[in-house]
Amino acid sequence: MSKYRSLEVGHISRDGYYDYQTSRPMQCVIQGTRRILWPQTVFYDIAVTDDLHLLAQLGPEPNYRWMDYVRETLHFAKQYDVSRIVTLGSMFAECPHTRDLPIDVSVDGVQSDPDSEYNGPIGIPHIIDAMAIEEGFDTTSIWVSVPQYLGGNEPCPQATLELFQQLASVVGLYLKAQELEGKADQWRAHCDVMVRNNADLDGYVDQLEHDYDMKQHARAIASSGAPAVEQLVQEAEAYLRDLP
């Protein structure tokens, strides 16, 4: 946001949405004065160009009253005549850091890649997307997979970069990301060192690379549309799923 003109235009009251033992307030000192920062959701109007503004919603996932929270979110979207709601998210998956991180995109609730359909627990971005569709909004949902072997809650600049690039594609503009690209390079270099220093992890990543490359190759062949090739791809993917 710091690369563009942005203005805070509203927020969702924190009352009733958060468990403060889970989403704890933070203490900080600003110009010598101690302040407490409570978890809350803030909306920013970001001027990408004179003709394109993004309404960005930033805040921790609420612990309670998700439906009410989403209704307030959509109320802001209607107030600012939002034409498309884009939700972003990440999840841990079995993928190598040495390849492009897998991206899953759905438009108006329809998955672009049926093979990557997700079944399981969901978070507030999914609820926003689903309720926005019910309210008549156009929606795009973008999720990136992060290597699960990294673990922890450390930021993943590569995942952020790939989400950013997908967002740029949705809005149809080049968005500035030079600083983020540098952080992504540093992240990959750090992961390389970590893997090289652990023989078991090194072997695991080798297997993930092999599986990833096999799937990409199978998808490329499948694009030819030949029935025999389609069957071959299905058999290859079934084999990969059965690997330990």
Tell where the protein language model's regions lie, with residue ranges.
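A conserved C-terminal secondary-structure "cap"
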Residues: L150-P244
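A generic structural motif
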Residues: E8-D15, R84-S90, E179
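Solvent-exposed alpha-helices and their adjacent loops that cap or buttress functional pockets
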Residues: Y44-D51, A77-K78, A132-E135
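Hydrophobic/aromatic beta-strand patches that form the interior of the parallel beta-sheet core
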Residues: G10, L55-Q57, V86, D138-W143
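N-terminal short beta-loop-beta anion/metal-coordinating cradle
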Residues: M1-E61
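Internal, conserved structured core segments that host functional sites
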Residues: L52, P60-D108, I128
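Short, hydrophobic/amphipathic alpha-helical packing segments
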Residues: W66-L74, P125-H126, F164, V233, ...
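Catalytic cores of processing enzymes, dominated by hydrolases/peptidases
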Residues: E94-Y174
